[in-house]
Amino acid sequence: AALVGAWRLRRAGERERALGIGTLGLAELSHLLLLWGAGWWALTALCETVRFVPYGLREHALLLVAAATVASWMLLALRERWRELALLCLALVPVALLALASAWRFDYQPFGEFGWLAWPLLFATHLLSLRRLAPLLPAKALSVAHVLGCWLLLGVLALELRYLFALLAEQYNAWRWLGWALVPSAYLLLVAGGRSLP
């Protein structure tokens, strides 16, 4: 209801600038309702995931819900030219960082369970939203989201490679940490090659 209220207030605020409550205009009320609705949506998704999804799948299920949510918000922001909702779509990477921190344990495999679906879908949604929402977003926010997404991608790939090397190596062997060196090195080689990356 708060998200719909934010949308209606935003549309009304474009026509009627003088209306509002106290010192808050319709645009500010729309921003507050948008944040309120997004907060409730996130809390509800978290509670229902904890309630219904088995323990080992929770983080990946939350990533799928977050990617689907941002994809739908992206479409709505594009259709309505809604800058605030487009800015809210950039919260996908911080949410993914929280999910990664929540799932962190020594034997965590990012592409295990449903991670093979959740992480690529999340990165595809992130890149698509960065590309499609670029005209609606401030350049600084777009740049920060791009850098955070790049670091998250490198971290997830390094974690997966570390897990695979840990399966091959014996305990107390340095090979298990090779993933942390190979992925950033490969990224630096790609960047140094002069190709334009997404």
Place the predicted regions along the sequence by residue:
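Alpha-helical transmembrane segments of multi-pass membrane proteins
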Residues: A1-P198
